[in-house]
Each structure stands twice: as structure tokens, then as C-alpha cells.
Amino acid sequence: NDGIADSLVPSMLTIDVTAANDAPTAIDTTVSASEDIPYVFTPEDFGFSDVDATDVLEGITVTTLSEIGTLSLNDTTVTAGQTISHDDIFNGGLIFTPLANDNGVGYDSFTFTVNDGDVDSANQATLTIDVAAANDAPTAIDTTVSASEDTPYVFTPSDFGFSDIDENDVLEGITVTRLSSVGTLALNETTVTAGQTISHDDIFNGGLTFTPLADDNGVFYDSFNFTVNDGIADSLVPSMLTIDVT
């Protein structure tokens, strides 16, 4: 309109809208690790969403650290506020190490933001780490028993020193790694051989006996070595059972 008349033919005004990058969103995730084994993160472990369909995860920033285990990048402890690239994660550089012999659901966690190559997420998310329990080998402990001259000694399970960091594990058997050298060690009246495994039940039922020589006695009279078993693993180091004969 020129102030008096409108144009006879309408025209079109086209509006171009230039795209702007939208910040991504970090999403809470949980990973499953195993006791005594460092967990190696992958990019997929970090929850990422972006309304810009072509944007992908380019990196993260660790905003708060794990409290129990250790988060490290290429063998160096990660610090709060540290930015870690997608490639560093993809190449296996980001690792979480739980405490030795420790485990649990919701064992540890840290928070992070994600980056799409241009901008960080406005929110931070939590990555929770579950650590599955693994069996730990038990420990055999040196012990001494007191037998009587000319009387076979009948062993009980409590004669064999046993310790296990897994508090629910108990003695399930022993292996005789070195034989007695003076008297005779027998299982159900058959002489025991080096390397023989003997179950808890055989010991509990009175099957394992030691017979000293006739009319013989002494402090530290004889001994043999053994390992203990928790039903899964043997102790790594044998211990000694000493027999005093009075």
C-alpha cells in the first residue's frame, strides 16, 4: 500500500530460520563391574540424548568423583571438573577400579555432563557402578593338636585353621600337600597320599586319623602340610598341622 491503494498482485515473503545447536541431555546409567577387576568404560556407558538428530557424544566432564573406588584416565587419577574425550573413552582409557575384595549393588557412582562437540548438557547425570562379588581364595592357618601315646588321633574340622575374607564361606575340605614323616595319616583306614583331597564330611565323620608309632611320644612329634578349600578355591599357600603326642 502506498497510502492510497493496495498493489493489485500479492507477493510472498519467505522467512529462513538458521539452525542453532541445542544442548544435549545427560541421562543416568548403571554399569556392572566385577570384584577385583578394573572396569573399562565405553562411550555407550554414558547416557546421551540430543534433539539435533545428527549430534553424537563427543566427550564428558566428570562433575563429582566416585567416593570408594578410583576413576582413572590412562593410569592417572581423574579430578573433578576434568573433561574426557569420546576417543579417550573409546580407546579404553577411562577405568574404574573398586577396592580389593569389595563389592555391592550401587557400590559407587559419579556424575557427569555430556558434550555434543559444541556445548555441554545443562544437566548432570549419575553413572552408578554395581560390583558383582567374586570368590576369594581362603587362607590356611597353622595349628597344633595334642594326641595321646598309643592312641589314634581322630581329626575334626576345627583342627584345620581356616580363614576367608568372604564371611559366608566355610571349610569344605583340605588337600594334604606334605605327609607326616613319623606316624601314619589315614582316611577310613587307608593311608593318605600326598596331594590327596579330603572332604569336610569325611573329617567330620571321624574318617581322618593319625596313628603315632607304638610307645612313642614327644612335643612337635610329627606334622603335615595342608591347604584348605571353601567349595570353590584352594588356599594359595599351605599351612602346617603339628601333632604333639603325650
What is each residue range found by the language model?
Residues 1-21, 33-40, 45-56, 66-134, ...:
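Acidic, turn/loop-rich segments in luminal/extracellular domains of secretory-pathway
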Residues 59:
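Catalytic-core segments of thiol-dependent peptidases
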